Amino acid sequence: MDDPVDRRAFMVSALLGTAGVVAGVQSLGARTPRGETPVATVNGPQTPPAPLFGLTKFLDPLRIPPTIRSYSRQYRDELDVSLTNARRRLHSQLPETMLWTYEGQFPGPTIEVRRNRRLRVTWTNELQGTVPLVAVRAPYAVPTPANTPGYRNPDRSLPAGVELIDGVAELPPWNVVHLHGALTNGGNDGWAHNGMSPGDSQLTEYPNRQAASTLWYHDHAMAVTRFTVHAGLAGLYLIRDEEEDGLRLPSGDHEIPLIIADRNLDTDPVTGALTGQLLFKFQYQPATGTSAPVTGPFTLVNGVIWPHLDVDARWYRFRVLNAANGRFFRLDLVDEAGTVHNDAVRIVGTDAGLLPAPAAVPAGGLTVTPAERVDLLVDFSRFKGQRLRLVNTGASVDPDIMQFRVESRSRHDSFTPPARLSASYVRLGSAVTVPEDHDEVFVATTLPGVAGRPHPEMWELQEITEPAELPTRFPEEGVIQLTDPATGGVRTFRRVARLFDDTTTIFIDRGRWVVWNLIQLGGAPHPMHIHMARFQLLSRRKFADLTAFDVAVGGTSRPLSGAGDGPSIEKHEEGWKDTFNLWAGEWIRVAGRFEGATGEFMYHCHILDHEDEGMMRPFVVHPPEVARFHMRSGGPAHHSGGSAHHPGGEG
């Protein structure tokens, strides 16, 4: 199940570049490759797909966000980016949609930088009015409300149980930019509380001391990120380096970003016609208040609903980002007969850079969860004169994403995927081992309904090592027991924080290796993002039985056991990443070294609804010499190894 908000998942959850001068950035326009027009028919007449919700699929050409590069100073590069209102057509058969944008573009312009070239960006808030969307919720009894446009009856009244979300219509432009995947100090990371109002600017510096990779920037305002990103505030940020240059991967018009997301739209209640107004509509259970993350019936690529792309019969490179609030995409490349051709696709990179070698698409398709990036090579030379589709086979709505129209004539293309990609890559546990003297962090995610609370939660856990501190009986709220498969012994953990504003409990000394243990106690999956560092997936285990976790109480009645090997780690999952999906019942371990930056950072579920509903927590990275003098909850604590946690409790 790759769409976390289909009926089954909902019920489960409910129950339990080079520096240069850029002139006139404000006038930048998105380009379309190869001079396409909305009515281009590359391969002659064919039967078009039936319109869906009145929109013709594959009618409009894919737009390519403009690339902007910085202007140079002696010691750094600089860039000015404005947040502005803009009207854009998401489909040529639609009226214009009001959006919040970076530089008037949806998605925002692609920022391209060179490794080790420091960039200072001035983000200026020029937005006006309130957030340009309508937010409603509908009870699950209303047939598929999240996957159909509109929300009102023909007389403009609300159907039974459908409600406008209080306060959303009054949300002002209060924004903060986070560069997702960046290794930068806390003051430049985009702390969620540090919003800027209209007329204000956010000044950030990005050192870019990291390998060539696909990052992205987006709004991260506290408690309202689901609305601001949905309104349009997201864009790509590419880091280039000499290692990548030497591979001579497809470039220029043959390197294309694919920023995939879903949206819903309002309708005229009388005529049923789509108005172009963004509609943030989701399902909920009236009895409990438990809600499903927002999804929509329209799939957009680079801000265009169901676009097409004319391609040469040669290799292409696609920088893919899942920028959806909550929808998962399981990608397959299919022909007109529906035959899968994933053997024409190679995965060459993930979130934080290139893989050591090209990897095949896994059997069953390539799952990309919210905020994940994949760097793909596709060989179109095999499909001269054909039309292919990129589809989402994990969708609970129409699977089509976009269409590729391959030209009929052959093209000279000397490129072949290199057998070796990143010579600097090392696999943790082989060439480099996480040192024995490392820190361990334990975090668990819960189902909705714990102690009557409606939303899934994220708990920071601290191990109870003194027998006298163990509960006298189980279950007890906030206490988790599990059987460690490495030793066979039972370990007991107590929750020490669950809300963002609870006491900070995770303190990491700069330069330390940390293994994060992420444990999923049931319900919908969670793509977990940790700021500031890059990580590798060390292991994936799966508990055989989750009934030991008593949802009503919020603790285990007996130790969770049977944590056997989970699904094998695919080759592309061995790359450096910053976002890891956590499926139901899984216990994954990811390792990273917190070096090169200090400050206060965040980690969270990147389903934006979950993030805003509480699944986000802070952590601190500081110099070890300073840490010994830091007074915090429980008193000062000199680093003693073994755990990144220091004494603390729930606030």
Question: What is each model feature region?
Answer:
Residues 3-4, 24-74:
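C-terminal segment of N-terminal export signals and the immediately downstream linker at the start
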Residues 70-83, 106-185, 194-230, 236-264, ...:
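Beta-strand cores of secreted/periplasmic/IMS beta-sandwich domains, seen most often
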Residues 97-107, 299-307, 490-510:
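N-terminal edge beta-strand
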